[in-house]
Amino acid sequence: MKEENWNNNLEQMMEAGVHFGHQARKWNPKIAPYLLKDTKKIRIIHITHTARLLADACDFATNAAREGKQFMLVGTRYQTAGLVATTAKKARCHYVNTKWLGGMLTNWSTIKTRLQKFEQLEAQEIAGAFNHLPKKEVAVMKRQLSQLRKYFHGIKYMKKVPDIVIFINQHQDYTAIQECIKLGIPTIGLVDTDCDPNLVDMPIPANDDNRTSIRWILSQLTTAIKEGRSTSLKQ
Protein backbone atom coordinates (compact mmCIF):
# COMPACT_ATOMS: atom_id res chain seq x y z
CA MET A 1 0.00 0.00 0.00
CA LYS A 2 1.69 3.21 -1.17
CA GLU A 3 1.25 6.48 0.69
CA GLU A 4 -0.37 8.20 -2.30
CA ASN A 5 -3.21 5.68 -2.06
CA TRP A 6 -3.87 6.28 1.63
CA ASN A 7 -6.81 8.66 1.17
CA ASN A 8 -8.68 6.15 -0.97
CA ASN A 9 -7.84 3.37 1.47
CA LEU A 10 -9.01 5.45 4.43
CA GLU A 11 -12.43 5.75 2.81
CA GLN A 12 -12.55 2.02 2.15
CA MET A 13 -11.54 1.28 5.73
CA MET A 14 -14.30 3.51 7.06
CA GLU A 15 -16.83 1.74 4.85
CA ALA A 16 -15.57 -1.64 6.07
CA GLY A 17 -15.87 -0.59 9.71
CA VAL A 18 -12.18 -1.13 10.38
CA HIS A 19 -12.20 1.74 12.89
CA PHE A 20 -14.86 0.40 15.26
CA GLY A 21 -13.47 -1.01 18.49
CA HIS A 22 -15.06 -2.44 21.63
CA GLN A 23 -16.98 -0.71 24.38
CA ALA A 24 -14.90 1.89 26.18
CA ARG A 25 -14.67 -0.17 29.37
CA LYS A 26 -13.42 -3.22 27.47
CA TRP A 27 -10.00 -2.19 26.27
CA ASN A 28 -6.28 -2.73 26.67
CA PRO A 29 -4.41 0.47 27.65
CA LYS A 30 -1.44 -0.65 25.53
CA ILE A 31 -3.51 0.03 22.40
CA ALA A 32 -4.05 3.67 23.43
CA PRO A 33 -1.48 5.19 21.00
CA TYR A 34 -3.55 3.88 18.09
CA LEU A 35 -6.93 5.22 19.23
CA LEU A 36 -8.80 8.49 18.86
CA LYS A 37 -9.21 10.37 22.13
CA ASP A 38 -12.40 11.42 23.91
CA THR A 39 -14.58 8.51 22.85
CA LYS A 40 -17.09 7.71 25.57
CA LYS A 41 -19.09 4.62 24.60
CA ILE A 42 -17.01 2.87 21.96
CA ARG A 43 -13.27 2.98 21.40
CA ILE A 44 -12.46 4.25 17.91
CA ILE A 45 -9.30 3.24 16.10
CA HIS A 46 -7.32 6.02 14.42
CA ILE A 47 -7.27 4.59 10.91
CA THR A 48 -4.37 6.77 9.82
CA HIS A 49 -2.27 4.57 12.10
CA THR A 50 -3.94 1.51 10.62
CA ALA A 51 -3.09 2.65 7.09
CA ARG A 52 0.55 3.31 7.99
CA LEU A 53 1.07 0.01 9.82
CA LEU A 54 -0.80 -1.95 7.16
CA ALA A 55 1.43 -0.38 4.51
CA ASP A 56 4.49 -1.51 6.48
CA ALA A 57 3.06 -5.02 6.84
CA CYS A 58 2.24 -5.20 3.13
CA ASP A 59 5.75 -4.08 2.16
CA PHE A 60 7.19 -6.71 4.50
CA ALA A 61 4.90 -9.40 3.07
CA THR A 62 5.75 -8.49 -0.53
CA ASN A 63 9.49 -8.63 0.12
CA ALA A 64 9.18 -11.90 2.04
CA ALA A 65 7.10 -13.49 -0.71
CA ARG A 66 9.61 -12.32 -3.30
CA GLU A 67 12.28 -14.20 -1.33
CA GLY A 68 10.18 -17.37 -1.36
CA LYS A 69 9.10 -17.22 2.28
CA GLN A 70 6.17 -19.38 3.38
CA PHE A 71 3.14 -17.86 5.11
CA MET A 72 0.57 -19.28 7.49
CA LEU A 73 -2.81 -17.66 8.18
CA VAL A 74 -4.39 -18.43 11.55
CA GLY A 75 -7.99 -17.69 12.51
CA THR A 76 -9.83 -20.38 14.44
CA ARG A 77 -13.12 -18.68 15.23
CA TYR A 78 -16.07 -20.49 13.66
CA GLN A 79 -17.44 -17.25 12.17
CA THR A 80 -14.30 -16.64 10.10
CA ALA A 81 -13.26 -20.22 9.28
CA GLY A 82 -14.52 -20.05 5.70
CA LEU A 83 -12.97 -16.64 5.08
CA VAL A 84 -9.59 -17.84 6.38
CA ALA A 85 -9.61 -20.93 4.15
CA THR A 86 -10.70 -19.05 1.02
CA THR A 87 -8.20 -16.23 1.55
CA ALA A 88 -5.29 -18.56 2.28
CA LYS A 89 -5.95 -20.72 -0.77
CA LYS A 90 -6.05 -17.70 -3.07
CA ALA A 91 -2.67 -16.56 -1.80
CA ARG A 92 -1.24 -20.11 -1.61
CA CYS A 93 -0.68 -19.87 2.13
CA HIS A 94 -0.92 -22.58 4.75
CA TYR A 95 -3.73 -22.04 7.23
CA VAL A 96 -5.35 -23.19 10.47
CA ASN A 97 -9.05 -22.36 10.80
CA THR A 98 -10.57 -24.94 13.16
CA LYS A 99 -8.56 -25.48 16.32
CA TRP A 100 -4.97 -24.74 17.16
CA LEU A 101 -3.44 -27.90 18.60
CA GLY A 102 -0.75 -27.08 21.14
CA GLY A 103 2.69 -27.75 19.69
CA MET A 104 1.74 -27.28 16.04
CA LEU A 105 4.92 -25.25 15.67
CA THR A 106 6.96 -25.90 18.80
CA ASN A 107 6.54 -29.67 18.46
CA TRP A 108 6.94 -29.74 14.71
CA SER A 109 8.60 -33.18 14.58
CA THR A 110 5.43 -34.79 15.97
CA ILE A 111 3.16 -32.74 13.70
CA LYS A 112 5.30 -33.70 10.71
CA THR A 113 4.80 -37.38 11.56
CA ARG A 114 1.03 -36.88 11.72
CA LEU A 115 1.07 -35.10 8.36
CA GLN A 116 2.94 -38.05 6.88
CA LYS A 117 0.25 -40.36 8.29
CA PHE A 118 -2.38 -38.06 6.77
CA GLU A 119 -0.72 -38.30 3.37
CA GLN A 120 -0.43 -42.08 3.66
CA LEU A 121 -4.09 -42.61 4.58
CA GLU A 122 -5.32 -40.30 1.82
CA ALA A 123 -3.19 -42.16 -0.72
CA GLN A 124 -4.62 -45.48 0.46
CA GLU A 125 -8.16 -44.15 0.24
CA ILE A 126 -7.66 -42.78 -3.28
CA ALA A 127 -6.03 -46.04 -4.43
CA GLY A 128 -9.01 -48.03 -3.13
CA ALA A 129 -6.93 -49.92 -0.56
CA PHE A 130 -9.69 -49.59 2.03
CA ASN A 131 -11.85 -51.93 -0.07
CA HIS A 132 -9.51 -54.84 0.58
CA LEU A 133 -9.21 -54.52 4.36
CA PRO A 134 -11.37 -55.83 7.23
CA LYS A 135 -14.32 -53.55 8.08
CA LYS A 136 -13.14 -52.86 11.64
CA GLU A 137 -9.69 -51.84 10.42
CA VAL A 138 -11.20 -49.60 7.75
CA ALA A 139 -13.48 -47.96 10.34
CA VAL A 140 -10.46 -47.09 12.50
CA MET A 141 -8.53 -45.73 9.52
CA LYS A 142 -11.47 -43.62 8.38
CA ARG A 143 -11.84 -42.12 11.85
CA GLN A 144 -8.14 -41.28 11.86
CA LEU A 145 -8.39 -39.72 8.43
CA SER A 146 -11.44 -37.68 9.43
CA GLN A 147 -9.61 -36.26 12.46
CA LEU A 148 -6.48 -35.50 10.47
CA ARG A 149 -8.51 -33.71 7.81
CA LYS A 150 -10.33 -31.69 10.44
CA TYR A 151 -7.20 -30.27 12.06
CA PHE A 152 -4.53 -30.47 9.35
CA HIS A 153 -6.29 -29.89 6.03
CA GLY A 154 -4.85 -26.37 5.83
CA ILE A 155 -1.24 -27.46 6.44
CA LYS A 156 -1.18 -30.81 4.64
CA TYR A 157 1.51 -29.58 2.22
CA MET A 158 3.63 -27.83 4.84
CA LYS A 159 7.16 -29.26 4.97
CA LYS A 160 8.57 -27.02 7.69
CA VAL A 161 7.42 -24.38 10.15
CA PRO A 162 6.24 -21.24 8.32
CA ASP A 163 8.48 -18.21 7.93
CA ILE A 164 5.71 -15.71 8.75
CA VAL A 165 2.37 -16.14 10.52
CA ILE A 166 -0.65 -13.84 10.13
CA PHE A 167 -3.25 -13.73 12.92
CA ILE A 168 -6.75 -12.29 12.75
CA ASN A 169 -7.76 -12.69 16.40
CA GLN A 170 -5.25 -12.31 19.19
CA HIS A 171 -7.37 -13.64 22.05
CA GLN A 172 -8.65 -16.69 20.20
CA ASP A 173 -5.20 -17.77 19.04
CA TYR A 174 -3.02 -16.65 21.94
CA THR A 175 -1.36 -20.08 22.22
CA ALA A 176 -0.29 -19.95 18.59
CA ILE A 177 1.16 -16.47 19.06
CA GLN A 178 3.16 -17.69 22.05
CA GLU A 179 4.58 -20.53 19.95
CA CYS A 180 5.69 -18.02 17.31
CA ILE A 181 7.32 -15.88 19.98
CA LYS A 182 9.16 -18.90 21.37
CA LEU A 183 10.48 -19.87 17.94
CA GLY A 184 11.20 -16.31 16.79
CA ILE A 185 8.78 -16.54 13.85
CA PRO A 186 7.79 -13.04 12.61
CA THR A 187 4.10 -12.28 13.10
CA ILE A 188 1.55 -9.93 11.57
CA GLY A 189 -1.69 -9.50 13.46
CA LEU A 190 -4.95 -7.58 13.60
CA VAL A 191 -5.22 -5.91 17.01
CA ASP A 192 -8.58 -4.67 18.20
CA THR A 193 -9.04 -2.23 21.09
CA ASP A 194 -8.93 -5.07 23.65
CA CYS A 195 -5.61 -6.43 22.36
CA ASP A 196 -1.94 -6.00 23.24
CA PRO A 197 -0.12 -4.71 20.12
CA ASN A 198 3.22 -5.74 21.62
CA LEU A 199 2.43 -9.46 21.25
CA VAL A 200 2.96 -9.40 17.48
CA ASP A 201 5.86 -8.01 15.48
CA MET A 202 3.69 -6.08 13.05
CA PRO A 203 0.39 -5.01 14.64
CA ILE A 204 -2.45 -3.69 12.47
CA PRO A 205 -5.03 -1.82 14.59
CA ALA A 206 -8.40 -2.96 13.24
CA ASN A 207 -11.82 -4.31 14.09
CA ASP A 208 -11.29 -8.07 14.42
CA ASP A 209 -14.95 -8.94 15.05
CA ASN A 210 -16.47 -7.72 11.79
CA ARG A 211 -16.07 -10.01 8.78
CA THR A 212 -16.04 -7.06 6.37
CA SER A 213 -13.19 -5.43 8.28
CA ILE A 214 -11.21 -8.66 8.46
CA ARG A 215 -11.80 -9.41 4.78
CA TRP A 216 -10.60 -5.94 3.76
CA ILE A 217 -7.38 -6.17 5.77
CA LEU A 218 -6.66 -9.69 4.54
CA SER A 219 -7.28 -8.67 0.94
CA GLN A 220 -4.53 -6.06 1.23
CA LEU A 221 -2.09 -8.54 2.76
CA THR A 222 -2.80 -11.32 0.27
CA THR A 223 -2.51 -8.90 -2.65
CA ALA A 224 0.91 -7.95 -1.30
CA ILE A 225 1.92 -11.61 -1.00
CA LYS A 226 0.78 -12.42 -4.54
CA GLU A 227 2.58 -9.34 -5.87
CA GLY A 228 5.80 -10.50 -4.25
CA ARG A 229 5.49 -14.00 -5.67
CA SER A 230 4.67 -12.63 -9.11
CA THR A 231 7.75 -10.40 -9.04
CA SER A 232 9.89 -13.35 -7.97
CA LEU A 233 8.67 -15.46 -10.90
CA LYS A 234 9.48 -12.70 -13.39
CA GLN A 235 13.08 -12.35 -12.22
Curated annotation (Swiss-Prot):
Annotated Pfam families: Ribosomal_S2
GO MF: structural constituent of ribosome
Record-level GO cellular component terms: chloroplast; mitochondrial small ribosomal subunit
InterPro entries: Ribosomal_uS2, Ribosomal_uS2_bac/mit/plastid, Ribosomal_uS2_CS, Ribosomal_uS2_flav_dom_sf
Biological process (GO), any one: translation
Top-level division of the source organism's lineage: Eukaryota
PROSITE patterns: RIBOSOMAL_S2_1
Locations listed in the record: Plastid, Chloroplast
UniProtKB keywords: Chloroplast, Plastid, Ribonucleoprotein, Ribosomal protein
Keyword ATP-binding among UniProt keywords: no
The UniProt record lists the keyword Chloroplast: yes
HAMAP family hit by this protein: Ribosomal_uS2_B
Family of this protein: Belongs to the universal ribosomal protein uS2 family.
Protein name (record): Small ribosomal subunit protein uS2c
